[in-house]
Amino acid sequence: MIFYDKLKPADVLVIGSADGRVIEAIEYIADLHKQHGFKFAICLGNLFSHKRTTSADVVKLKNEKVKVPIPVYFGVGTAGLPESIISHMAMYGPEVAPNLFCMGICGFMKTFYKFTIAQLGGSYNEEKYYQPPEKFEQSLNEKCFHRSDVQKLSKRCDILFSSEWPEDVQENSTLPERKLPKGCMPLAALAANCMPQYFFVPGPVYYEREPYKNSAAINVNTGTVTHFVALAPFKNSKNEKFSYAFTLYPLTTEYMQPAPPNCTASPFEHRPIPLKRASEDQIIPQQTNKFHKSKSSTALFKSKKDSSSSLNKMHKSESHSALNNLHKSESGTSLNNRRSKVGPGSCFFCLSNPNVALHLIVAIGNEAYMALPKGPLTTTASNTPALASSGHVLIIPIAHASALSTLSDTSYEKTLNEMNRFRKAVTDMYNACDSDALVYEISRANGVHLHWQMIPIPKISSHRIESVFLEMAKEAGYDFEERDVEPHELNYFRVFLPSGKILIHRLQLRERFDLQFGRRAAAKILGLEDRVDWRKCVQTEDEEKAESEAFKMCFKPYDFT
């Protein structure tokens, strides 16, 4: 299996539901591929069906009597799969024939060309959608999707395709209104969360709305425009358009595309994933009045009724204790505010910047380094006697990256591994000084330069870390989930607890997240509320140099660099 290291544009073919005419559909794809040279193809709806797909069809594909010339991706659709396909997948995985990949009812896949595809098959049945997970039985013959499927897929992708339509797709469109499938709320919410470049559905008719902008919360350099396309059934009697060819561009600056002039606002803005029926007390996590732990997902939820609380109003401080004042322009911004791009030459977390404060750097690895912050939260007075420095340190990727997920796969793995190695080394240092490690991170697509904050908490106080974070999240109206981030996930606040538990708050579209939240919580745990604003804690250069030397002495037994 060949994966291509560098992202390049790819020509893609999508066809409407073949309704079981799988051989005819594959031959059609093969003919077009000979003419145009597609990189991969997607089959919407029911590529296979119990009624029209014969066992002979399946044998032809498996034995390559009918060859699939390029990777072709499909989902379960609404008709289920033939038993022979289900049995094959149980034994051999999703490749049901050479180059033919089934993504099941709920699937997320990276193509050979490193584009990501999310797929939600099956139909929407309200009763089954809201069933408790332990009562919901799903198989490749099951024709319904569950709310947990929608949750799993809610991450950035290049292409999204589904069997059901999203509701309100014509919202904000200036095209003449048409009679289209009603659609359902979960698909609208999924589209809002995935923010795909292309969203395809099988339709009774062909329909293509104007492209829409997802949100300014995603940096213009990572793409914000979605093309929604519904394709008529494969070779339909009305001769409506059933195939769609396009060039898919990587979301990189090299291939940045301007927004089309006919772009509209998104029809799916502010669509949280529905997890409870409207008739129940808890409609969706954001509307519940009680902070609780979900039995099904271990997620922690809180109402946004208290969004006017003091914590939610505090956005005038800096997002982090930086190596200098670079990020002053971020003060008071919400996720959807745009700002000019900061390159490595002007980023004060980049070692290539001639103005970087070198005296604050305490260790340099191959992929990441550590530096002391300007204006540390902790001091030797707040720490245990054994810790002869402030102990507050930043772990920073050497590569200029707003988030780890913006790095290539190889760099992502290497950088994450080394950052975790630094985190463990500092944790060991803290532990030897009768302290635990509090680590937190803000990851944003439109951030400047990702970093992790590490703060020592004396063991006598560390039992309060989780309760304080949850308490302050409740006051601010933030939703925490007990899980780690998915590979290449974007837009979240993460806190690593000494117990090994990880809490995630997903930063929502247009959310005004308190960029000082992590430092504010740490200050409350330590009784250092007067040191929340890092600018009030700035030291002289001589004091910083002395602090740096003190940290290096403490860290020397654990320094692997």
UniProtKB/Swiss-Prot annotation:
Residue segments, region Disordered: 286-338
Principal location class: nucleus
Pfam entry (one): CwfJ_C_1
Subcellular location: Nucleus
Residues carrying Phosphothreonine: T298
Domain of life: Eukaryota
Keyword Nucleotide-binding: no
Keywords, in A-Z order: Meiosis, Nucleus, Phosphoprotein
Polar residues: compositionally biased ranges: 320-337
Family annotation (CDD domains): MPP_CWF19_N
Listed InterPro entries: Cwf19-like, Cwf19-like_C_dom-1, Cwf19-like_C_dom-2, HIT-like_sf
GO biological process terms, semicolon-separated: meiotic cell cycle; mRNA cis splicing, via spliceosome; mRNA splicing, via spliceosome
GO cellular component terms given for this protein: nucleus; post-mRNA release spliceosomal complex; Prp19 complex
TM stretches of this protein: none
Entry GO MF terms: RNA lariat debranching enzyme activator activity
Family: Belongs to the CWF19 family.
Main function: Has a role in meiosis.
Protein name: CWF19-like protein mug161
Lineage, top ranks: Eukaryota, Fungi, Dikarya, Ascomycota, Taphrinomycotina
Gene behind the chain: mug161
